[in-house]
Amino acid sequence: MKNEKTYKIGTLTYTTTGIILLSIWMLWGDLIWSLKDRAVGPSSTLLFKQIIDSEFLYGLIIIAFPNFTNIFLQPIIGFVSDRHRGRLGRRIPFILFTTPFIVLGLYGLAFTKLFGSWLHGVCPSLSLSAAQLIFFGISWVFLDFGSTLAASLFTALANDVIPREVIGRMFGLFRLVSLGVGMFYNYCLIGKVESHTMWIFFGVGTAYGLGLLLLCLKVKEGKYPPPEELPPLPNGKKRTILQTVTTNSVIYFRQSFSMAYYRWFIVATVIANLAFMPINGFSIQYSKALGIPTDDYGKYVVFSYCISLFLSYFLGVLSDKFHPLRTGIASQLVYAVLMFAGFFIMINPKAFSYIFILHVVISGCFFTFVASLNSRILPQGIFAQFISAIGIVSAAFNMIAGPVIGKIIDVAGDYRYTLLLSALISTASVLLLYKVYRDFLKYGGDKNYEAPMPE
């Protein structure tokens, strides 16, 4: 036992047994988060399309609105949680805070049709679709508020408690769990969403509430150095609330965006993630336009997830070995070629099945490769703050991109343009990631890299 290998991160020390137990509970948390994440997107899309058929409104409400709230909410939660020191740690208290909002939002979506029908009966001048859209919107606001705040917290918690020696593998396992949940949803549930909306959303909401509570009880954070204190005012005066908010905002934006290295990294990360939005956001509608049954669409997803499931752990190992920047660039390059080719050939159900499966597999490879990239590049002391800064820029891009893509499809009447857009964005991401890679080498590369700390 004396020679048992130990793993350290901050004040936390794990034996091999401890790492296994940590892995179990973090994977449990990822299972619950993935269930919510995998189910909400497609289920909300199908529910929304049952209520009203407008790609512009879909892009505005489902895509643009969450990204608009990201701009304001993620910086707050990132900045505050980085500097919070409490009995339960700096991430877990905020995870607990967000959970009721997510559960209420999911329950609201479950009863959207029921409440909407009731409102239409009470107020006949309001159409049934408008009444249901009102309740959908209210529930979506609750769900979005909680999800936006929680999105970066789980990643930040993983960054705080998982030792660097195993973080790539751990994120590979996270990906494996996420894919498994996606397979279950798309094989067993997606074909039933339109007829069993209430039970699916209600079940996911209940599982999320109980599951996240258990995660917060079982995972323990370490001790953190005291946060940087605000400089004193002249004559020892106390700051007003407005002065405190203003000073913290200046610190936030200075630290997050003052260094060119991190500005390039943020933009590269955002553009790389944006490359998959055109297909991910409109693939269900594309399949329906080609006459593909929803069950068949779900089977394509399940098959592609089976491939990704097999690859996920090994991709994590490759990421640890070759660095996420290199593997991320390679996967984006392959994806760009696929999308350019797909634009010319994806014109019938058979072509859709092949290109869509490859899209899911290759985009999945990218996300697995770069899952630990933020932990390998960003300063640990203000990690969640940087994640939120990425979220701000990502939200700004996505907020514009969602409705624009929807409008392009409405005008062109052809979903094939989603592939061309993905190809162009992916090509841009390759160039941006290569720029970041060159700067990474200047700061020490694989052996001597230390994340530079902004002043």
Feature names for model-found ranges:
Residues 72-87, 311-324, 409-410:
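Helix-to-loop junctions at the C-terminal end of transmembrane segments
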Residues 325-367:
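C-terminal transmembrane helical hairpin of 12-TM major facilitator-type secondary transporters
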Residues 149-162, 365-379:
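Intracellular juxtamembrane helix-capping segments at the cytosolic ends
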Residues 3-69, 261-268, 272-290, 297:
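Helix-loop boundary and gating motifs at the non-cytosolic
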Residues 91-107, 326-341:
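Structural signature of the two symmetry-related core transmembrane helices
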Residues 69-71, 168-190, 391-402:
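Glycine-rich segments within core transmembrane alpha-helices of 12-TM secondary carriers
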Residues 2-18, 226-265, 452-455:
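Juxtamembrane intracellular "pre-TM" segments in multi-pass secondary transporters
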Residues 90-92, 191-206, 407-426:
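A membrane-interface helix-boundary motif in multi-pass transporters
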